[in-house]
């Protein structure tokens, strides 16, 4: 019976483990400074991975950094020179407030708008939490 249990346990780990690891990864942000511009090269890929609208994320970055910006494909250009550390701090704040579930700490969430209120709905535990409007 122990051998059968261990075989089933190994099979379960093989089926669940890769997907669980992929879901828990938060992508790194790639920031490049140019004269009078700051470019985030993998912005579209990050938005897709976090299940967020690119323009919603861009709006957050523009408000937090107080500079205008444009989205072109996967690239987000901020029209102002900002330190990569500052941009990474804003990215971490976005993840904290608009991506991570406060109940179970999962990033498997979606941001819904219900009337004038934004609600963070967790797909892992089912919790719904109101968040600050953008």
UniProtKB/Swiss-Prot annotation:
<dbReference type="InterPro" id="IPR016190">
    <property type="entry name" value="Transl_init_fac_IF2/IF5_Zn-bd"/>
</dbReference>
<protein>
    <recommendedName>
        <fullName>Translation initiation factor 2 subunit beta</fullName>
    </recommendedName>
</protein>
<dbReference type="InterPro" id="IPR016189">
    <property type="entry name" value="Transl_init_fac_IF2/IF5_N"/>
</dbReference>
<comment type="function">
    <text>eIF-2 functions in the early steps of protein synthesis by forming a ternary complex with GTP and initiator tRNA.</text>
</comment>
<comment type="similarity">
    <text>Belongs to the eIF-2-beta/eIF-5 family.</text>
</comment>
<dbReference type="GO" id="GO:0003743">
    <property type="term" value="F:translation initiation factor activity"/>
</dbReference>
<dbReference type="Pfam" id="PF01873">
    <property type="entry name" value="eIF-5_eIF-2B"/>
</dbReference>
<dbReference type="InterPro" id="IPR002735">
    <property type="entry name" value="Transl_init_fac_IF2/IF5_dom"/>
</dbReference>
<keyword id="KW-0396">Initiation factor</keyword>
<comment type="subunit">
    <text>Heterotrimer composed of an alpha, a beta and a gamma chain.</text>
</comment>
<keyword id="KW-0648">Protein biosynthesis</keyword>
<dbReference type="InterPro" id="IPR004458">
    <property type="entry name" value="TIF2_bsu_arc"/>
</dbReference>
<dbReference type="InterPro" id="IPR045196">
    <property type="entry name" value="IF2/IF5"/>
</dbReference>
């Amino acid at each position: 019976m122990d051998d059968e249990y261990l075989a089933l346990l190994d099979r379960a780990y093989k089926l669940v483990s890769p997907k669980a690891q992929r879901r828990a990864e938060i992508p790194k942000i790639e920031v490049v400074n140019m004269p009078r511009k700051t470019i985030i090269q993998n912005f579209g890929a990050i938005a897709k991975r976090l299940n967020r609208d690119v323009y919603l994320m861009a709006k957050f970055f523009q408000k937090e950094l107080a500079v205008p910006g444009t989205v072109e494909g996967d690239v987000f250009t901020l029209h102002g020179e900002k330190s990569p550390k500052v941009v990474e701090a804003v990215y971490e704040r976005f993840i904290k407030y608009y991506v991570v579930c406060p109940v179970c700490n999962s990033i498997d969430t979606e941001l819904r708008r219900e009337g004038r209120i934004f609600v963070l709905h967790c797909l892992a535990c089912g919790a719904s939490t109101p968040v600050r409007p953008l």
